[in-house]
Amino acid sequence: MNSVYNTYEKGMNRINQHIALILLQSIFCRQYNLIGINSTQALTIPIKQYHQKSRKMSTSKDIEVETSATSPAFANTSGDGEIPSFNGDEKAKASDFANYFCSYAQLYHQKQMLADHNRMAAYHSAIMGNADVFKDKVVMDVGTGSGILAVWAAQAGARKVYAIEYTDMAKHARQVMKANGVEDIVTVIQGAVEEIVLPIEEDGLECDDPEHPERVVDIFISEWMGYFLLRESMLDSLIRARDKFMKPATGLMFPSHTTMYVAPVQDEEERRMNCNEYAASMSDWQDFQETTKQVYGVEMEILKSDFDREQKDYYMWSSRWRELPAASVLSERKMIKVLDMMTCTIEDSKGVDMGDEASKFEFAVDGDREQGPISGIAGWFTADFKSRTDEVGKDSAPKLLDPTILSTGPEMGYTHWGQQVFYFASGIPLMQGQTTNITGSLEMTRTKENARLYNCRIKYASSRNSNNDGKQLMKSAPKEQVYMIP
């Protein structure tokens, strides 16, 4: 009987970390009133980042994991959903707050962004370096958070700044305005930007367009970007605000353009750790299953395949936040999407269409120069602060004399966005004297369950050619995998 209980104790110890994580998620969700979200959505909050960063490096042998074209948990989840414009729908507001806005009401979250030097330096340079275009202008900061961008706009000479914030962080933003002596210039408005009414007459503002009397804003500033640019789908709200409040011929967007990039990377320790933790979780299940049968007489094997799917989706088919060293990038980056913030539509913000030519990639990695294998594909973005390039405003809008670029690529070091890495189940080896080619495409779509989250479908194949005569030595079968960006 002792051996049975020893087996039980061993099995329970090995699954304790999984139970602890679930309990921790539950506590966090209750603390911040995250009612009605599922375990996958719970992992999108900082607990998941803490779990990823605190995992110990595994030294066990690399585990081969069977790949599938579409992971069952994410099958048929690509949707065309839009972020609700609310229009008084209190139920929609409550759901979106629980699933998205709530964490932005916490100062710890704001501090994480404010401590991002690359982020701060880029916005500060873009605003203060172009103070001439802010002088005497009307500015709107969408998603002001702590209000720092609104403060800079006022300091740069803006006549009026409207700082829009949906959460109770608006109360802190008002304190920040007063502490920095700009409370007479900056008006903090708490609410969804889709629903707010600007105090235009009260502030003495006039519009030259009688058909659109609310178009009084000269400059929009916003830090709306999420992981791999589009995650969180805040761009929808910014586009609606732009179309409603901006002067179309002379208005400016900060940032003005954004670009998404991908590149092959080497990050084998993390890739192998994901594989090994998946294998360990399945070993935990086996112990649990046997113990439950021996001690309690209940057969649980019927659930093994479902548990396997859950674990594989989490460990293998979810992208990972990484702060990659520049040396891990094995080839030139490939641009897969560009957004002009003056002309992009909500349809543009929904993702990356595999039918677009830009979504296709081709990389060549020289085995003589690089150490293999290729671990996966990484994605990141840049945000440009520059003059308008669209036909409507390129001649009539003010010119930015000091353009700025914010990059979240590995060459920049730490940003809170990091890079999203989509790991292959097995690394692609590099061989001396040979060039390894990867060709494929990437599709990014919103999930049906939550329009603020995205899935990425990556199709790829590899081949190797001799560096001497160019002869093809190997060609793999095409592979396809769907990843969630948590």
Question: What is each PLM-predicted segment?
Answer:
Residues 58-142, 147-442, 447-486:
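Class I SAM-binding transferase module
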Residues 21-24, 34, 43:
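Leucine-biased recognition of intrinsically disordered, low-complexity hydrophobic segments
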